[in-house]
Swiss-Prot record:
Gene3D superfamilies, per database record: 3.10.20.620, Autophagy protein Apg5, helix rich domain, Phosphatidylinositol 3-kinase Catalytic Subunit, Chain A, domain 1
Pfam families per the UniProt record, alphabetical: ATG5_HBR (PF20637), ATG5_UblA (PF20638), ATG5_UblB (PF04106)
Gene: Atg5
Protein name: Autophagy protein 5
Positions of crosslink type Glycyl lysine isopeptide (Lys-Gly) (interchain with G-Cter in ATG12): 130
Signal peptide start and end residues: none
GO molecular function, one term: Atg8-family ligase activity
Family in the record: Belongs to the ATG5 family.
UniProt source species: Mus musculus (Mouse)
Membrane topology per record: Peripheral membrane protein
Keywords from the UniProt entry: Acetylation, Apoptosis, Autophagy, Cytoplasm, Immunity, Isopeptide bond, Membrane, Ubl conjugation
A GO biological-process term: negative regulation of protein ubiquitination
Length: 275
């Protein structure tokens, strides 16, 4: 991969100032103060909210506490989506800090998966990495790794260790020089305006004539409504890690530098703010 390490670091250390507030109908023994945290964009809510849980449990009786879950403006937050994706998709046009409501009751079974432990997050994360490598390298790279390498990827993410994670992850970002890129680009496109969870299709980084495919090429093929017509008004923002990459950006470069730790490009299509 091309070595733009500053980009990788900026992506990894991206943070979202967040205010956690206990839901008003939760039963407490005294008033629950809000809890403030800088959330890592590349992580998952269930990995980084132990302190939030402890903070609110201090003012609650044990019998009033069941499985914790989070919500933003009425939408339950999926723990298996990276934090940065949740913010870009649901709150990118709102003021900071991001206001998240904490619940300990009435778990929304229809909307959320249960997360009994961090093992569930690890299993989901490794499953995504394996799927991404199946697309990129027919699973050859991830399958040639030892179990300790898989563990190092997970521990690097869990403990927020950039160098520990990238020492192994860089192998997943390599490809034979004669091929100009991966077999397929692992991506998922999310929209708030549809019931479908996300769009995911096979898409090559290089065209048959050797030209590099761009972000715009991908969108025009799989989500044309996200791209404004040349003479038309821009109706959507295309967000990755809180920024709007230029549509001319090569998809291979984006995959190498703006993928989340699970090796997927998580792309949010949100309505253009009207202000």
């Amino acid at each position: 991969m091309t070595d733009d390490k500053d980009v990788l670091r900026d992506v990894w250390f991206g943070r979202i100032p967040t205010c956690f507030t206990l839901y008003q109908d939760e039963i407490t023994e005294r008033e629950a103060e809000p809890y403030y945290l800088l959330l890592p964009r590349v992580s998952y809510l269930t990995l980084v909210t132990d302190k939030v849980k402890k903070h609110f449990q201090k003012v609650m009786r044990q019998e009033d506490v069941s499985e914790i879950w989070f919500e933003y403006e009425g939408t339950p937050l999926k723990w298996h989506y990276p934090i940065g994706l949740l913010f870009d998709l649901l709150a990118s046009s709102s003021a900071l800090p991001w206001n998240i409501t904490v619940h300990f009751k009435s778990f929304p079974e229809k909307d959320l998966l249960h997360c009994p432990s961090k093992d569930a997050v690890e299993a989901h994360f490794m499953s995504c990495m394996k799927e991404a490598d199946a697309l990129k390298h027919k699973s050859q790279v991830i399958n040639e790794m030892q179990k300790k390498d898989h563990k190092q990827l997970w521990m690097g993410l869990q403990n927020d260790r950039f160098d520990q994670f990238w020492a192994i992850n860089r192998k997943l970002m390599e490809y034979p020089p004669e091929e100009n890129g991966f077999r397929y680009i692992p991506f998922r496109i999310y929209q708030t305006t549809t019931e479908r969870p996300f769009i995911q299709k096979l898409f090559r980084p290089v065209a048959a004539d050797g030209q590099l495919h761009t972000l715009g090429d991908l969108l025009r093929e799989v989500c044309p409504s996200a791209v404004a017509p040349e003479d038309g008004e821009k109706r959507s923002q295309v967000m990755i890690h809180g920024i709007e990459p230029m549509l001319e950006t090569p998809l291979q470069w984006l995959s190498e530098h703006l993928s989340y730790p699970d090796n997927f490009l998580h792309i949010s299509i949100v309505p253009q703010p009207t202000d």
